[in-house]
């Protein structure tokens, strides 16, 4: 399997904002606070505007790395391949390493991605993970996200859109530490 051909590039492009978006002042105020938090969590049921809020959040950052998660991304290798590809160009070698080493190479590949992000990003940036609820019960993916958040450079922020708060020790710890800006359906 050639991983670069398994990556659907359109999932890595932020959707275009709808021209009829209703902008709520309070929501804009909350979104503008995302700079103060490593992680912004937008959770609400279907149809409440999570993706729309994530699109609006993009406007606060010069560099946006987007990943729209779909059901097939429950495969950890495919998930990691998309995550790596969200930071192209410059991460092609990590796809090759993942392809050659398989799932056993994920630790070194993830470390390589963290190092790439740390040296490549020189300004505030955001990684958006839209529809994270589709993979939130995959232990390996949660561990990778935990490693990324724990070792991120200070100018990289994460935004996660999901239907419920992920029930993992890392999310609980981050919320207790005040690392998470939480936006709910009441705010949307």
Placement of each model-derived feature along the sequence:
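Conserved NTP-binding/hydrolysis module of P-loop NTPases
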Residues: 76-97, 111-115
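Conserved adenine-nucleotide phosphate-binding loops and their immediately adjacent elements
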Residues: 1-31, 93-97
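Conserved P-loop NTPase "ATPase switch" module shared by AAA+ and STAND
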Residues: 116-141
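A short hydrophobic beta-strand->loop->alpha-helix junction that borders the nucleotide-binding pocket
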Residues: 43-44, 65-75, 82, 99-103, ...
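P-loop NTPase Walker A phosphate-binding motif
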Residues: 40-68, 81-85
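Alpha-helical sensor/transducer elements of the RecA-like P-loop NTPase core
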Residues: 26-27, 52-56, 139-188
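A short beta-strand-to-loop transition that corresponds to the Sensor-1 phosphate-sensing loop
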Residues: 44-46, 131, 160-165
């Amino acid at each position: 399997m050639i991983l670069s051909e398994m990556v659907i590039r359109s999932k890595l492009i932020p959707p275009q904002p709808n021209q009829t978006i209703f902008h709520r002042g309070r929501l804009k105020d909350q979104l503008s606070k995302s700079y103060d938090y490593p992680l912004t969590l937008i959770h609400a049921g279907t149809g409440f505007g999570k993706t729309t809020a994530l699109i609006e959040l993009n406007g606060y950052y010069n560099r946006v790395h987007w990943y729209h998660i779909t059901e097939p991304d429950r495969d950890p290798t495919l998930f990691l391949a998309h995550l790596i590809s969200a930071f192209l160009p410059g991460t092609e070698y990590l796809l090759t390493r993942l392809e050659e080493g398989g799932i056993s190479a994920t630790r070194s590949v993830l470390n390589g991605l963290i190092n790439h992000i740390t040296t490549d990003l020189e300004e505030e940036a955001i990684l958006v993970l839209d529809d994270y609820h589709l993979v939130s019960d995959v232990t390996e993916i949660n561990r990778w996200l935990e490693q990324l958040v724990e070792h991120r450079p200070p100018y990289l922020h994460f935004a996660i859109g999901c239907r419920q708060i992920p029930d993992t020790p890392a999310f609980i710890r981050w919320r207790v530490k005040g690392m998470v800006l939480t936006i709910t359906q009441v705010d949307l």
